Amino acid sequence: MIKTVLLFINLTLVIAQTPDKRGYIIKVGDNLPEFVMDFPDGSQINSVDLLGNVTMLQFTASWCSVCREEMPHIEKEIWKIYKNIGINVIGIDRDEPAEIVEKFAKEIKVTYPIALDPRADIFALFADRNSGVTRNIIIDTDGKIKFLTRLFDPKEYLEMKRVIHGLLENQFLEEKQTLVAQKQILKELKHKRTTDQNISTKNIEQKLFLLERKLNLKARRLSYAEKLL
């Protein structure tokens, strides 16, 4: 019985790590793996820190001609449009040192951050280590993988942009609901202040005012971005 269970577990692990026809070992609906990204400037980001925002991970390399074709589109049509709305766009360069990665970014004129993956260990969490780059992974605010691309197919790229926009709209609605809930709490505090003069709501009011202004700006930017899709 124990041998049967162990065999089943081993088979499950093998199936889970078997690449699909595009080389992916993860699929839509999976959780974002935990890993640490190092950047050419010496900074680090843990994948856990990405939660709470829509995230796009873009696997790339300077020797990849398809990446060079796709990345200016990502810069112009995703990063520059959505970076002030609440998206993480991070390139992950495999098998290359920091100086090459920095030169690469300048050559193709991208400003979103590019992390280092010198041994392709991060890449191998998502796809077969021996498969090619030019891959985008779209992750929602809860760390669920929502979309996967391979190479630079115009139809798939457009669908990816639509998925990103939809996720950002959902993120905006969640933030708006939070604001409504916080306003209700403020209202209750103001009511209590009639009996307890020690309760101060000034700081709360200021924070909610700034949040509302930020959300109004985000709504206008989302509306503008939708027209570009």
Where are the model-predicted features located?
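N-proximal helix/coil linker or "cap" segments that precede and/or mark the start of modular domains
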Residues: 15-34, 51, 175, 190
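Non-globular targeting/processing and membrane-anchoring segments
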Residues: 32, 169-229
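A short beta-strand-turn-helix
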Residues: 34-55, 126
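Thiol/disulfide oxidoreductase modules built on the thioredoxin-like
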Residues: 108-111, 118-165
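Conserved redox-active cysteine motifs that mediate thiol-disulfide chemistry
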Residues: 59-76
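Hydrophobic beta-strand anchors of alpha/beta hydrolase catalytic cores
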Residues: 56-57, 89
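Conserved segment of the thioredoxin-like fold in thiol-based oxidoreductases
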Residues: 79-120
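Sec-dependent N-terminal signal peptides
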Residues: 2-13
